């Protein structure tokens, strides 16, 4: 599919979902909730989300070490933040992962190693997320009575878990599968990823950092909710936010806009939160993530003479 058409479709999906949700709620109610927000709480959440970027940089350094790639912290941070800017702020066909891979290659790595370095970081981010989702499943049965919702979450969690296992053990498939181009593409990812896990020191640190990164998202949204006057037990956030993040991974919208709002309205609805409040919280969350990504635009601008066309 033409990249411009793909971007256009994502924009349509995001705008369509947000428009649909706004039409289902009292828009003035959303505005009033946002107008009465406690700015101090929002600043706290913004600080936490910014710290999250620095922690994510540390994880990426450990992931790169699994490939014997030694990149100093400053360069790693600049590359990651540039990628974050493109993921969050730029509705373009040049995604953040492409930017990260490009700048890794500019550090003297081969295209294959650069690509693997980015995919490995994505992979371990997903491992930490799925671990958190699976750990919070008991809360699903405690807080949600809807059997269809329960079944849907279990199906998604099981499906993603099996997909991750497949990726980590792709190279162990029978030899007659190795000629398939799609399978071969996962071989290096499988081998390096498994080696990284087997290295107890590196593997444990990466897993802990990955879980911590997602917990920061949970805590940040809790703080935002408090700033909006939304009262939900911590367990509700621990259940909903990882699921929201998991659904945002599906590349059907711009930076998860629309998808995030839909999942948060439905998810928090099960916990008794009004649609207007849940939608206001989701919009605020998206805006703060956008603000956090903006420094990456400054970094990219300084490097723009080296950016791919």
Residue ranges and their predicted role:
Residues 1-81, 139, 143-249, 280-309:
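Predominantly cytoplasmic-facing regulatory/coupling regions of multi-pass membrane proteins
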Residues 67-68, 99, 106-109, 228-229, ...:
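Short helix-loop-helix connector
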Residues 74-78, 92, 96-97, 107-123, ...:
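Membrane-interface alpha-helices at helix entry/exit sites of multi-pass transporters
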Residues 83-92, 242-257, 261:
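Transmembrane alpha-helix interface/packing and boundary motifs in multi-pass membrane proteins
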Residues 96-105, 254-269, 283:
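Re-entrant/interfacial helical elements at transmembrane boundaries that shape
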Residues 99-103, 115-118, 130, 209, ...:
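Hydrophobic alpha-helical membrane segments of integral membrane proteins
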Residues 119-139:
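Hydrophobic alpha-helical transmembrane segments of ABC transporter permease domains
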């Amino acid at each position: 599919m033409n990249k411009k058409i793909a971007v256009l479709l994502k924009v349509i999906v995001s705008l369509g979902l947000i428009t649909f949700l706004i039409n289902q709620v009292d828009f003035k109610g959303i505005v009033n909730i946002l107008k009465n927000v406690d700015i101090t709480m929002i600043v706290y959440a913004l600080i936490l989300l910014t710290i999250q970027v620095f922690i994510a940089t540390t994880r990426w350094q450990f992931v790169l070490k699994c490939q014997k790639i030694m990149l100093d912290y400053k360069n790693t941070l600049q590359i990651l933040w540039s990628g974050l800017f493109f993921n969050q702020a730029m509705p373009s066909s040049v995604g953040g992962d492409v930017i990260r891979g490009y700048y890794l290659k500019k550090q003297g790595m081969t295209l294959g190693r650069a690509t693997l370095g980015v995919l490995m970081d994505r992979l371990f981010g997903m491992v930490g997320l799925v671990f958190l989702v699976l750990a919070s499943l008991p809360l699903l049965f405690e807080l949600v009575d809807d059997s269809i919702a329960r079944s849907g979450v279990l199906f998604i969690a099981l499906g993603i878990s099996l997909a991750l296992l497949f990726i980590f053990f792709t190279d162990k498939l029978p030899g007659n599968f190795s000629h398939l181009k799609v399978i071969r593409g996962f071989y290096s990812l499988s081998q390096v990823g498994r080696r990284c896990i087997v290295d107890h020191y590196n593997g444990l640190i990466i897993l802990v950092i990955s879980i911590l990164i997602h917990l920061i998202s949970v805590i940040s949204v809790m703080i935002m909710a408090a700033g909006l006057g939304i009262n939900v037990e911590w367990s509700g956030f621990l259940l909903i936010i990882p699921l929201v993040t998991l659904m945002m991974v599906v590349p059907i919208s711009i930076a998860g806009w629309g998808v995030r709002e839909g999942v948060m309205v439905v998810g928090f609805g099960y916990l008794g939160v009004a649609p207007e409040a849940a939608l206001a919280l989701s919009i605020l969350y998206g805006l703060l993530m956008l603000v956090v990504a903006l420094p990456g635009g400054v970094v990219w601008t300084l490097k723009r003479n080296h950016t791919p066309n």
